[in-house]
Amino acid sequence: MKILHSNLIGNSDRHLFIIHGFLGMGDNWKSHAKKISDNNYTTHLIDLRNHGRSFWNDEFTFDIMVEDILNYANFHKIEKFSLLGHSMGGNVSMLFAQKYSDLLEKIIIVDIIPKKYKPHHNNIMD
């Protein structure tokens, strides 16, 4: 099992995973993460698969990215956390919340179009 790359800012028992948008990376949120960590959070700037310094794979769907986040949390032994998702990361975060709401304290969605897509859109990079 491959684990997503991340940079951590702050040192707290409260965790916030920041999930970037399409073609982005966790470091895009570094200045915000520094301010958030001042509010007693460890902020995880996560690079989704096929982005930043995370692994690359031909499988690239929202469902698989949700499982990548779950694997990341389990690997780091984080039982409860909050999610902030931007754009594509917002879609991934909402799907994560549908499947694993018991793991979440909060969910914050930034700048997405709330639309249900047809099934042929599920595989992002055909």
Kindly give the residue locations of the regions a language model identified:
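Flexible "cap/lid" loop of the alpha/beta hydrolase fold
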Residues: M94-Q98, E105-D126
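Gly/Ala-rich beta-loop-alpha elbow adjacent to hydrolase catalytic centers
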Residues: G85-G89, S93
